[in-house]
Amino acid sequence: MKPLHLKLNNFGPFLKEEIDFSKIDNNELFLISGKTGSGKTMIFDAMTYALFGKASTEQREENDLRSHFADGKQPMSVTFEFQLNHRIYKVHRQGPYIKEGNTTKTNAKFDVFEMVDGKYEIRESKVISGTQFIIELLGVNADQFRQLFILPQGEFKRFLISNSREKQGILRTLFDSEKFEAIREILKEEVKKEKAQIENRYQQIDLLWQEIESFDDDNIKGLLEVATQQIDKLIENIPLLQARSKEILASVNESKETAIKEFEIIEKKTLENNILKDNINQLNKNKIDFVQLKEQQPEIEGIEAKLKLLQDITNLLNYIENREKIETKIANSKKDISKTNNKILNLDCDKRNIDKEKKMLEENGDLIESKISFIDKTRVLFNDINKYQQSYLNIERLRTEGEQLGDELNDLIKGLETVEDSIGNNESDYEKIIELNNTITNINNEINIIKENEKAKAELDKLLGSKQELENQINEETSILKNLEIKLDRYDKTKLDLNDKESFISEIKSAVNIGDQCPICGNEIQDLGHHIDFDSIAKRQNEIKEIEANIHAIKSNIAVHNSEIKFVNEKISNINIKTQSDFSLEVLNKRLLENENALNNQRDLNKFIEQMKEEKDNLTLQIHNKQLRLNKNESELKLCRDLITEFETLSKYNNITNFEVDYKKYVQDVNQHQELSKEIEDKLMQLSQRKLIEQNNLNHYENQLETYNNDLELNEQSIEMEMSRLNLTDDNDIDEIIAWRGEQEELEQKRDTYKKRYHEFEMEIARLESLTKDKELLDSDKLKDEYELKKGKMNTLIDEYSAVHYQCQNNINKTQSIVSHINYLNQELKDQQEIFQLAEIVSGKNNKNLTLENFVLIYYLDQIIAQANLRLATMSDNRYQLIRREAVSHGLSGLEIDVFDLHSNKSRHISSLSGGETFQSSLALALGLSEIVQQQSGGISLESIFIDEGFGTLDQETLETALDTLLNLKSTGRMVGIISHVSELKNRIPLVLEVKSDQYQSSTRFKRN
């Protein structure tokens, strides 16, 4: 993330201020300078607040950021533009406040924009979602931003001294190590699921084992006493258990089969005895009923005599009935003959009337034939009448269009000839344009090289002048420095260390006398007077301090000048003067103008030729289209003429309407004549068919009448013969016998029933006598008791066998399930063993007690420390090295940092360093962290860093080393900003962002020393 522009309104001491960071060239190191309280740190607060809604230091609340001099009606807001991964973003955050005159607070606002095609497009417009968008975009939260981008007062060393858990949060974000923690959680859940499945399988095995039936058998009970956790023993006992269960089942089955056989024997005996008893009873009953039936024999004989007489008179009765039917048929035939004769007379009359109509119709035959001939000849014309009608309508229009198309075609041909004359022999020359473009490009390149060389030479002369001026200043300051050092060397430094011993000497003098032995040197005291001029010593010390201060200031100036010379030398080395053309700039410009004019002329000529060619092609296409239309017109005109000629030749008409009217009239007349003729023919045909039918009917009726008369005569003869055979003299005898016919069916049924029952009794008595012959009837009660006893025993054993068989099969199913569970469990334990081990290792149960994520973070921290030690060695004069504390526990340690002192060859806690040493270590660690993050693909772009204070704790030599380190960051593409009150930094750092305050508001400006 690299700042581009910062705009502050009513923020801290800045009422309305803008800072343009784009003025910082090539990622220069710059100093933010100003008096205490001027608002230097507020610049860092503004950037942090714009991004996260918080200050750069945790102690400052949001309410503390609003200016006390702000207009009560105006909000506090910060607009911050920055670059990230070659994309530009802008954020605008407005703080909440109570507007003057209101009692309710105006809510905060936050907008996030991204530049697309030179314009800002909004991405978020809500405070919470917008802040989350920034966190995801930068890859850090506010606390991590303070440790990576902005190192505020009091927090610069926070990453250095933070514990493992705090470092873990920062490094996790920087190096995207959460995926390793996710892996650990996934493995943990997998192991948990697998263990639950394994435990569940053990429970299923135990449940199945407990449900196995023992049949109250000691052997099986002994086998079931094995614990279910001993799965190998279970596998060993299962075949024994199954074998013993089969033995028990076989024993029960044997008892069951014996009981079934005994029951079947008694069941058969009981059934046979019951059947015999029933047969004896049935035989006795049938004999009694048979005797009663024989008593009806006389009555049945009388019935049979009546039935015989009824049967003998049947033929006579049939002849009498037949006579009546024949007489009825004769009467009907006579009626039919009379009706048919009348119908034939009516049909002959109708035929005579229709013959008259036919003769009248045939008189118009010649006229109808002529009309049919006309219709046949002109039918094809009438069917396509629209075609001929359209030809009459289109012929005049087509003549006019043809003449117009001919005129237009002639005009286009003349235009084409004119265009061809304009083109002549000219052709487009694009190769010449390419050649001229290449020439112009080469000339422009030569001109640019000359201009760049002139600019580079001017810059070089300027830099050489600056360098010479700096060298002269260094020479002058070196000369002054030598004089001061000579002057310093001339001072008598003896007794200078007694300046602060005046009170000590006075105390000794008051405690001794002349002649005493001196407690310091042991000599005899000769005099107690003032032998030392303390005022003179103090004066010399002040003079020496002043000279030393001047020497220190001159050395600082020389160091600054040397740094500036180094910077100038870098710029000089970057200046490149290229080889240029021998021609002057004036000659090249003249050649450039000539070639550009030639290029424009050739382009105009090519454009004209292309336009003419395009016009020629257009005219050619138009001529082709006109010719096609003219050809089409001529073809259509010829077709119309041919159709009109055809119509007039065939129809002899020259008017379509008259032809249509006559044609339709002829068709109507012909159709009417044909329909009437057909109707008459149909009527004659129908009359002829009807007469033929009636004639056939008449012949049929006459033949029937003759047949019926013959039948009647034969039937009378048969009646006389039957009456003679039956000795019947008149019809009264016949009527009496006929009266019996109403009872005939009842009499026949009574006779047949008697004979049927008589026969059935004979058959049944014979059958029962054969079944009971030579058989003894047993005691039914004794058989019944024995039957119930055997049946109960059999049912009991069948139930027992069914239960044992079911339990045996159930035992087999359960033991098979147990074996299946055990096999699956063994395979599952084998398959999951590696996952269990891996889960324990990544969870920290290993020889280093490290989780997978911390192991990865330790790797990155080691790289960061190694990179930091490269600078720390320089800054500490090869005394200190940062090392990672090796002590770890429970996977959450291993990220603490200690310092190794090469002078004592021992490591010690980081808190034992002095303030300056802590600053050196923190700076080296911060720079190492940023460089390792840049090398890795953690998704965070650390393109800038801002440091607030810390340099005041450094001595002169360490300060020089730290500044050189920060200056060298320019080559890594990092922007570095520093807040410090150290005066030497103003001389060492060329670019300064100066913050001035007038006790009311502050302002900023960039300046160069």
UniProtKB/Swiss-Prot annotation:
The gene is sbcC. This is Nuclease SbcCD subunit C. Heterodimer of SbcC and SbcD. Keywords: ATP-binding, Coiled coil, DNA recombination, DNA replication, Endonuclease, Exonuclease, Hydrolase, Nuclease, Nucleotide-binding. SbcCD cleaves DNA hairpin structures. These structures can inhibit DNA replication and are intermediates in certain DNA recombination reactions. The complex acts as a 3'->5' double strand exonuclease that can open hairpins. It also has a 5' single-strand endonuclease activity. GO terms for biological process: DNA recombination; DNA replication; double-strand break repair. Residues 176-364, 392-502, 535-802 form a coiled coil. Signal peptide: none annotated. Belongs to the SMC family. SbcC subfamily. GO terms for molecular function: ATP binding; ATP hydrolysis activity; endonuclease activity; exonuclease activity. It comes from the Bacteria. The keyword Nuclease applies. Pfam families: AAA_23, SbcC_Walker_B. ATP binds at G34, K35, T36, G37, S38, G39, K40, T41. It comes from Staphylococcus aureus (strain MW2). Gene3D superfamilies: Helix hairpin bin, P-loop containing nucleotide triphosphate hydrolases.
